[in-house]
Amino acid sequence: MDKVILVLLMSLGASSQPLTDTPRLFSMAVSRVQHLHLLAQRLFADFESSLQTDEQRQLNKKFLPFCNSDSIISPNDKHETQRSSVLKLLSISYRLIESWDFPSLSLSGGLSPKLSDLKTGILLLIKASQDGADMFSESTTLQLGPYENYYQNLGGEEPLKRTYELLTCFKKDMHKVETYLTVAKCRLSPEANCTL
């Protein structure tokens, strides 16, 4: 982790030198988010299989949670995703990952360090893509509610429902980030077909 932060600080400090290994950074970021998405799917499947009755499973499947990250403005469909700029997709991905800084602490699987590494990689890609533009200016900063309060209040007294809500939101957000990073990476290769 210290190496990642050192690399980040060195690259941010060397603004006169562009990052030339962007395709490799994209490959690493896509690989990491794919791993996180698979991990989210596994955690969700393990949770569902731990439920004792089919009625409990059906009850949970009827619940469609509102996630804290739903307040992050993102493309509504695959066409809008494909029309979005690489920088916009990276910015949305960063914000989605950032929205899990606190909630990931309550999920198993050692997610926090993995999310932190991915967030650092996405920040490097933003730096490489923006050519000095201030991506996180006050006009574009989204104010999300405090994550800890939102996710602590989910499900009230029902820990099963709370866990279900967290896992559902995490799986959904990792799928979004995987899609956005894959489309952004594809745009680097002119001969690639970037359809979803």
From Swiss-Prot:
Domain of life from the UniProt record: Eukaryota
One BP term from GO: positive regulation of growth
GO MF annotation list: growth hormone activity; growth hormone receptor binding; metal ion binding
Signal peptide: 1-16
Protein name, UniProt field: Somatotropin
Annotated family: Belongs to the somatotropin/prolactin family.
GO annotations of cellular component type: extracellular space
Residues reported in the UniProt entry to bind Zn(2+): H35, E178
Localization, UniProt: Secreted
UniProt KW keywords: Disulfide bond, Hormone, Metal-binding, Pyrrolidone carboxylic acid, Secreted, Signal, Zinc
Cystines in this chain: C67-C169, C186-C194
Reported function: Growth hormone plays an important role in growth control and is involved in the regulation of several anabolic processes. Implicated as an osmoregulatory substance important for seawater adaptation.
Modified residues (Pyrrolidone carboxylic acid): Q17
